A protein has these predicted regions:
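Acidic, surface-exposed loops and disordered segments
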Residues: 1-155
């Protein structure tokens, strides 16, 4: 629904993201809370679909604060760290009775430009947040699951 997200619920969701594990506990995540109509309008410029959510979390990381794995070509932890943070926030949202949708079909540079996000922050995804409508049902994409036999191999 378009009902505003309670500040108390939003703070619990953000806290779940803050305490989520990150590589070497570097905590490179940066979360931008988009609630004002003006900010939502700027964010929507990049969306193919209007989610009509009362709140969005633009999720990224400070590229200067990520851990680099020297055993794997200095691979950066940022995308993984932010994915863990987003997952923790989604789980908390669901626990509080909110729906959350991971929006990955974005143009990160355009989101950064439209919202004046600093150059040293890499935007990974946007999370929409809102309370479920009473008639909400999962889409077909969310009800079809593969079996563990297909996905897991015991060694």
């Amino acid at each position: 629904s378009e009902k505003d997200v309670k500040e108390e619920d939003l703070n619990k969701i953000l806290e779940a993201g803050r305490v989520a594990p990150t590589s070497h506990n570097n905590q490179p995540q940066r979360i931008y809370v988009v609630k004002s109509e003006e900010a939502k309008e700027k964010l929507m410029k990049d969306f193919a679909y209007n989610y009509k959510a009362p709140c969005y979390l633009v999720c990224g990381y400070n590229v200067d604060e990520v851990w680099r794995n020297d055993l794997d070509g200095d691979r950066e932890s940022g995308d993984i760290d932010v994915s863990i943070v987003i997952t923790h926030m989604m789980l908390m949202a669901e626990e509080l009775g909110l729906g959350a949708c991971w929006i990955g079909r974005i143009t990160p540079e355009l989101v950064k430009k439209n919202l004046d996000i600093p150059e040293n922050v890499k935007v990974v995804a946007v999370l929409s947040l809102g309370y479920h409508r009473e008639d909400d049902k999962p889409s077909k994409l969310h009800t079809i699951r593969r079996s563990n036999e297909e996905l897991v191999k015991f060694l």
